[in-house]
């Protein structure tokens, strides 16, 4: 408690905490907001991290920070800011500059996504409409409420937008810094609260065992050489009785997806999914299938699999 009070008591650190409670920010973004320049910002961030009030998240050549999500740190910050006047002039100016930084982030995301839009649209045209698939996902998961939802390979953050309103906490991971930029911008623009993203590998996610109620793996497995490892990680982090939802293509023969779009596997066979799930203590149901658009010769069937973690899961795949 004393260390936390000492760390939060410095004015610049208090401003940093106020900003990070609103959204995750890189060091560069914090510098843009905290005018004039704060040469001791790295020292402040180190002290806040050591006190358990912020979390450090490396992301390629970037480092992002967020307000603590741990039970002690979060409770301390909630209590601290409940006593502060958010209309205090300096905090209000910071909030206004944060909006400007967020607008710049959105422009960066739009520029990146415009470069891949043609590819994205071409793939979308090959399969069943996304809105209907998303409706089926929510139906299969149930309306919650969920304690914690995790999205493996979050991409644009669409699954977080869909499920965050049904959860106390929702978090997505992705290897791509560019896609995380897109996801952050989308979540901010859509006003999605309680959802965060961070860089991570779906085969070694930064979450504790038995900590999630729902894990989603949406159109990720066909990019992997060992999809079973992502399924094993999902089982590890799921609570007993927790659900895993997987969306991916049924087996197909569209070789151009491998050559031009980096698909490692041409769809996922239910038989393989069943084996991988059983190996890590997941009870897998038959998939719900969505055929390609009528008249689409080179269309793709999309499957949604639902699995539930057994009360006594088997050992995980190494």
Mark where each language-model region is.
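A short acidic, Gly/Pro-enriched loop at the edge of an enzyme's catalytic core
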Residues: 203-214
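N-terminal helix-turn-helix DNA-binding core of bacterial DNA-binding proteins
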Residues: 2-40, 62-71, 136-138
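C-terminal alpha-helical "lid/dimerization" subdomain adjacent to the S-adenosyl-L-methionine
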Residues: 243-306
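Conserved alpha-helix/loop element of class I SAM-dependent methyltransferases that forms part
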Residues: 127-147
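Amphipathic alpha-helical dimerization/coiled-coil segments
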Residues: 72-122
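Class I SAM-dependent methyltransferase SAM/SAH-binding core
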Residues: 148-150, 156-204
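A short glycine-rich, Lys/Arg-flanked "PGG" loop and its adjoining helix->strand segment in the class I
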Residues: 228-243
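A short SAM/SAH-binding and catalytic strip from SAM-dependent methyltransferases
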Residues: 213-226
